[in-house]
Amino acid sequence: MRKAMLTTIGVPLLMVATSADAARSDLTTAVSRTATDLIETWRGQGRRGQILRFVQPSLIGLIDGTISTLAPIFAAAFLAGSHAALMVGLAASIGAAISMGLSEALSDDGELSGRGSAAVRGALTGIATFVGGTFHALPFLINDTPTALKVAYVVVGMELITIAWVRRRFLSVPVHRSLIQVTMGGCVVAALGALMGHV
C-alpha cells in the first residue's frame, strides 16, 4: 500500500522535475543562440550599422536609466531611508526599462531607417535602461542611509564615466565634453530629487 502511494506520488513529481529540466535546457539553448546571433550580426555590420543598430539604442537606455531614476531614488532616500530608496529605485528602473524599450521598438520598425530589428533595439534599450537605473539603487542595500548615499554618488560617477567612454569610443565625442554634458543633466536631476526629499 505504502509502496503504491509512493509510486503514485513519485511518478508525477519525477515528470514535473524532468519537464522543468527540459524547459531550463531549452531556455539556455535559446539564450545561447540569441547571443551568438547578436554577436554574428554585430560583426557583420559596418561601423555605421553597429552604431545605428546596437550602440545608439543601448546608449539611449543607459543615459536615460542613469539620469531619470536619480530624482526618485534620492528623494526617497532623504524622505524615508535606504530601504524605500532601494524599492523606489528598482520600481523606477523596471518602469523606465519597459517604457524606453517599447518606445524604441514602436517608434521605428527599422524598414525605412535601416536601423535593423525593432525588437532587438527595443530589448537593448530596455536592458540598458534597467542597468543604468539599477546600479545606483543597489548601494541602498546598505541600511545606513548616509553611507548608502556616499556609495551611490561613487556609482553614479562610474556610470557617467562609462557613458563618456562609450560616446568617445563610438561617437567620437571628447570625454571632457561628454562628462560635462551628462554630469550637468545628472546633477540637475539629483539636486531636484534631494530638494524634494527635504520638502
Q: Could you tell me what each predicted segment is?
A:
Residues 136, 140, 163-168, 193:
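Structural signal for membrane-spanning alpha-helices in multi-pass inner-membrane proteins
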